[in-house]
Amino acid sequence: MDHEERRQIAMERIDTILIAAETDGSLMYPNMRDWNNVTFHPGYGLLPVNSPKVSQLSGPSLGKFIQILEVMRNLILTNRRTTKRDIFYQMFVSCSSQQEVDRLVSVAVAVLQVPRLILGVMATSKGLVVGDLRYTNSEGVVVDCSLAVGGDAIPQDVTSLSHILTSANFILVVEKDAVFQRLLEDGIFSGCLPSLIMVTGKGVPDLATRQLVHLLSSQFKLPVLILTDCDPYGLEIFFMYKYGSLAMSWAAEPLAVSSSVWLGLLPSELSVLDIGNSSMKPHSDMDTRKMMEMSKREYLQLESENEGLRRELEIMWDIGRKAEIQQIVEMRDDGFLAQEYLPWKISRCSWI
């Protein structure tokens, strides 16, 4: 299905929903926080089930949702694009916050089940990329990411990139910007590592960051190595790249990179790195609930090759504490992370 066909389908679905919502005075939409509403397909990631549990929009919230659908309809008709921030400025009288707009846009994507860019809505990209990568952006400018000091901003519309070139051997995804910048300062590109592309989503990755990682991995068959903190939320970020996210499973857009591996910081290596309990924070109640919930996910239960991940999650539980990559940096202020830890792990394929 090409782009124009998707736009036409989106228009038809918007018109149908607008009529139904105005007639019924309410709208049922999939509950995007319920893991029972998605199923795991190996090689693709998360997909919605046929009969999901639903929530309801009515009253003022429904009115705001209809406004957003009308904005999307106009964007498709005029073949224009806007950001969620711009939508908030258009609706600031009726919407109390950016978060409310973001939620209603997510509801629209879930109900329509089409990629957000088809609807003409982009999010401001926060991710960075640096390394062996060149491309031409939507304005015809050639961007050489090897020249970026501190990293180039990932474009909002990754689908518009052309003439993409790289001779990298792999993609290194770093959870936090502080670690990303420290690796640059410590000469990760001047050491003994093979040619690479380094990406950070600055925490939870946005859509553009995930699109870029998926695009580069699929187009150039590049392995994706992911470096996160050793805590439940670092592991969640790894799962997001590898299997997809709960919220975006409704968008009919492949974003998961099933070949991704967890490079570190692994629970099983904390003792080897001599990170003592006194320097690690204990798990919070929220951390504990997160680990319990993750352990029940379908992709951890179904995939035989996930024995290693299940074991690491058990070790994380047993340790009862969490460690940040920044602690390694502070313990060894001699470029250890860039010049020793990463080269050693990558050369020995020491990942999960």
Name what the model sees in each region.
Residues M1-L225, P232-I352:
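Nucleic-acid enzyme cleavage-core boundary/entry regions
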